[in-house]
Amino acid sequence: MLKKLGIKGRVLLLTLLPTSLMALVLGGYFTWMQLSDLQTQLLQRGEMIAEQLASLVAPAMGNHNTQMLERIATQALEQQDVRAVSLLAPDRSLLAHAGPSMLNPPPAGNSSHMMQRSGSDATRYQLPVFGRHRNLAGDLIPDESDRLLGWVELELSHSGMLLRGYRSLFASLLLIAAGLAGTALLAVRMGRTINNPLTQIKQAVAQLKDGNLETRLPPLGSQELDELASGINRMASTLQNAQEELQHSIDQATEDVRQNLETIEIQNIELDLARKEALEASRIKSEFLANMSHEIRTPLNGILGFTHLLQKSELTPRQLDYLGTIEKSADSLLGIINEILDFSKIEAGKLVLDSIPFNLRDLLQDTLTILAPAAHAKQLELVSLVYRDTPLSLVGDPLRLKQILTNLVSNAIKFTREGTIVARAMLEEEHEDSVQLRISIQDTGIGLSNQDVRALFQAFSQADNSLSRQPGGTGLGLVISKRLIEQMGGEIGVDSTPGEGSEFWISLNLPKTRDDAEDLPGPPLLGRRVAVLENHELARQALQHQLEDCGLEVTPFNTLEALTNGITGVHQSEQAIDLAVLGITTNDMSPERLSQHIWDLEHLGCKVLVLCPTTEQTLFHLSVPNPHSQLQAKPACTRKLRRALSDLVTPRRARSEPEETLSSRAPRVLCVDDNPANLLLIQTLLEDMGAKVLAVDNGYAALNAIQTEPFDLVMMDVQMPGMDGRQSTEAIRQWESERHGTPLPIVALTAHAMANEKRALLQSGMDDYLTKPISERQLAQVVLKWTGLALRNQGPERASERPELGLELQVLDQDEGLRLAAGKADLAADMLAMLLASLDADREAIKAARAANDQNALIERVHRLHGATRYCGVPQLRAACQRSETLLKQEDAKAFAALDELDHAIGRLAAEARTNA
């Protein structure tokens, strides 16, 4: 508090505060003492008056002279402070009274001495009158000295005493106030003697601060202040001299700068030339990267193209598996090359991430499958552990995520000489619409020091440069991975101990999508028992989880002999084991020994599936009865494992018989889509696979068709003019409820659906949904799933759509259009022609909706165009539609820029079509 006061205020406070406290304490003490003395005097005077009255009234009481008593009582009122007097008989009956009624009640008790009772306004006295009191009047009667003659009561008022006390207090306060006033005057005078010189010093310092260094202070009237003023004057003189020297130095420096201007100008010219050379070098680098991109992607596209052609030919399951691995490897290589070439685009923040559904377990296992040969060549064990509480169906950019995992696993393989590499996926936190995941890659390699960890995520750097020539690499992989993870809103890090290994981890938040029905256990395997042999503990644990996810009851064994004995012991019992999965290497046993054990197990009715390293598959090829179906590479993929075990339990020939029974009639399918190209494609694909199709282009026609004809399934487009897909579904469900009929399966067809939109589709009454473009395999699966009727001529499983990477997407891709049309050139041409015919109208409709600021109409028109692009080879327009629709639905401010890019993409496609016409 004192810090906020000035010197004058402090002087006043320190002077007046102690004085005031002392004056108040002393004044209060003496006033209290005086009031106490006055009260004591009042009590003594009351006792004295009572004694005097007792002597005066004793003869009258003895003679019962009432008049005398009245006269004495009246005379007693003339005494100071006496308020009332009462004279009582021995029985306390009233003999005489003078004055008003007494305020206080009589004292309690019956004492022979004087009694009193005090109140706030008066004090009441009571004294007994005995015969001895007559002695004072000279009227003593023998033997009556102790006889009670009566009582004397009087009451003294406190008002006089209080008045005298108040007068004394008032006088004390006057004296205190006078003393404080004098003290205050002295304090003010003292404060001025201190404050005025300080004010002069303050003003002088302010002038010095403003640059008036000639300012000097006069003598201030006291030794201490004069010394302070002298010091300030010396400081001002020193500052003045320093300023003069500084000004001289500035003038000299200015002259030097003026002399060096020509040199600086020459340096600026040299810097400008160097900048131009750097820009030219950057341009040359960009051209080189573009040329390299073309030169590298061209053979890769050839590999992918011929892989697709081979997949359409008659191949064994093993060959199809090899082709699938080649295709996935080529896709990964193409993606990695494009990302490296696009490193500058990542740094500029212009990289656009995809947002599509994917299966986390499949992505992780596919990554390990691609890299398994490199790991097995070094005799490393690859293990994938996906914790059971981890959601598998997520939404994100699977190709970018796979690229990151490929980089991490590849690094782990490079820098691990022996041991195990474990890929884990676990749930950290789950919300209603999203999950927080942690994916880690742990190895038993060389480990990293703290210095290596700090430099790990820098461009063109490696943890151990001494090893760079052996494993290879540019040092860009982790930098690109870190940038991609950060753009996804996640985090990447590493925990490592030199000599013990490293664990790279990713923490990422991804939206959830609906559960994948294919992940549920299927009837062929549900409840069956399987024996497992795997010497590696983590690999055995992962394999056991995979088999349990397939619906199997797993019994692990430590040796092949123990497994054979265990199966023999339960043979021909209710606990018989139908299947055996053997994870082996040549270090565990020879192919000849394995062949003998498989022969023994086959005779016990137990089908065997062998898992071995990719580098040893040729060695074990002749050890199994059917290597195409009973031999797989480590680490096992859950989907391949389920398919292989299902084939062992129920061979395809046996399973085809009930399918032929089911498919004895063709399924009747109603297709609803307002886009003629989409409607034509779905109708053609279904009819080519043997379905009976009725195609309509609006919801009203669909409702009318359902009310007049029986159907097994409805393929319903979501966004249509008039009655859209949701409204049509609700109308169909209402009509079914009125007729108490069996609900007809309705599958939504949509070009773009986020997680919340997919939930809304299912809540509106639809049973399932498919995302465009739709392949023959997807159509066959959904028809079989909801009708139980199989379609024929299902092509091999291929990715329906592959996100394009690179610096620029193609405007028109004829090969992609042919692939999306299931290899039908006429259909692909018709689809493209129908898209181009409606392109101008769609462009104008989008512009009109944008000008009218009609958000719903804008989303509807973009979605309609997006659906049409899903079946044509127009990658650039499709990507622009998808980005625009996503940003519009998210109400993102970048949506307008995306719409501008969409308009440019439409123009480029129209120009390209005219050029190729």
UniProtKB/Swiss-Prot annotation:
The keyword Cell membrane applies. Residues 824-917 form the HPt domain. Its EC number is 2.7.13.3. The chain crosses the membrane at residues 11-31, 168-188. It is found in: Cell inner membrane. Disruption phenotype: Greatly decreased expression of aprA, hcnA and phlA. Partially suppressed by a deletion of csrA2 (rsmA). Fully suppressed by deletion of csrA1 (rsmE) and csrA2. Its deletion is also suppressed by overexpression of small RNAs (sRNA) RsmZ and RsmY. Loss of expression of sRNA RsmY. Loss of protection of cucumber plants from fungal infection. One of its GO terms (molecular function) is phosphorelay sensor kinase activity. The modification Phosphohistidine is found at H294, H863. Residues 192-244 form the HAMP domain. It comes from the Bacteria. GO terms for cellular component: plasma membrane. Residues 291-512 form the Histidine kinase domain. The modification 4-aspartylphosphate is found at D717. Member of the two-component regulatory system GacA/GacS which controls the expression of secondary metabolites and extracellular products. Activates GacA by phosphorylation. GacA acts (probably primarily) by activating expression of CsrA1 and CsrA2 antagonist small RNAs (sRNA) RsmX, RsmY and RsmZ which bind to and prevent translation repression by CsrA1 and CsrA2. Involved in the regulation of secondary metabolism and in the synthesis of the antifungal factors cyanide, 2,4-diacetylphloroglucinol and pyoluteorin. This is Sensor histidine kinase GacS.
